[in-house]
Amino acid sequence: MKFAIFGNTYQAKKSSHAATLFKLLEKHGAEICVCREFHRFLKSDLKLNVKADDLFDENNFDADMVISIGGDGTFLKAARRVGNKGIPILGINTGRLGFLADVSPEEMEETIEEVYQNHYTVEERSVLQLLCDDKHLQNSPYALNEIAILKRDSSSMISIRTAINGAHLTTYQADGLIIATPTGSTAYSLSVGGPIIVPHSKTIAITPVAPHSLNVRPIVICDDWEITLDVESRSHNFLVAIDGSSETCKETTRLTIRRADYSIKVVKRFNHIFFDTLRTKMMWGADSRV
């Protein structure tokens, strides 16, 4: 099998996990392609002598499977690079939460064995696409988790006129607005009171950030509907964050958000159940009285 490997470049203390991964793949005779930035980190900063059959930059690669070793941020970066290639991504967690990258280092050897035995499942995760006339945002307009519209200064709110399929929904007076996929519903959106959505749901969550009204609540819509946003701000600009990567926009910029025409394929072990992950990693439903 041919693997393309992405990793974070700041967790030097956890370098042993990366070394273990390369040894496991070598043991199986894998063809290993490594993101050049990650390879440089392993060789120069960590002094690891790892096998790499090829190095690649950006999205200039092909493989049977992508492996992301790091946290959920590394997984999102890998997903952005994979784009519409249709290559499944396996996430190995050396970060903190590990919701997308949910294979622990202790499970790594067993998981690689399962990959070679074709004993795993692949989940299709929907992606959001942002359409606008801002060339900087169009460099990478796709989000696996969320697209967030946020105020740029620390004092005043922004007004976000929101329409669904051309029909007026409301004008949010808030610090921002988060448009999230089911995958992203357990990320930024959840932290501001958004709903938890099962990953396979064909929906999009719209969640305001610190709204200036008790009557404004999150809303869930069909994922084949189109969202149009017009923003007003005292500073005459605002931030757009696509899976955490932000750009400043002029308030004259109209944003259109819709489901992308491709999905991200996520590799899951058969014993990794979404509801189990909610309970163990987010303590969902935990009762300290018991």
Swiss-Prot record:
Its EC number is 2.7.1.23. It is an enzyme of class 2 (transferase). It holds the Pfam family NAD_kinase_C. InterPro entries: ATP-NAD_kinase_N (IPR017438), ATP-NAD_kinase_PpnK-typ_C (IPR017437), NAD/diacylglycerol_kinase_sf (IPR016064), NADK (IPR002504). Its cofactor is a divalent metal cation. The keyword Nucleotide-binding applies. One of its GO terms (biological process) is NADP biosynthetic process. Keywords: ATP-binding, Cytoplasm, Kinase, NAD, NADP, Nucleotide-binding, Transferase. It is found in: Cytoplasm. GO terms for molecular function: ATP binding; metal ion binding; NAD binding; NAD+ kinase activity. It comes from the Bacteria. Involved in the regulation of the intracellular balance of NAD and NADP, and is a key enzyme in the biosynthesis of NADP. Catalyzes specifically the phosphorylation on 2'-hydroxyl of the adenosine moiety of NAD to yield NADP. Belongs to the NAD kinase family. This is NAD kinase. It comes from Bacteroides fragilis (strain ATCC 25285 / DSM 2151 / CCUG 4856 / JCM 11019 / LMG 10263 / NCTC 9343 / Onslow / VPI 2553 / EN-2).
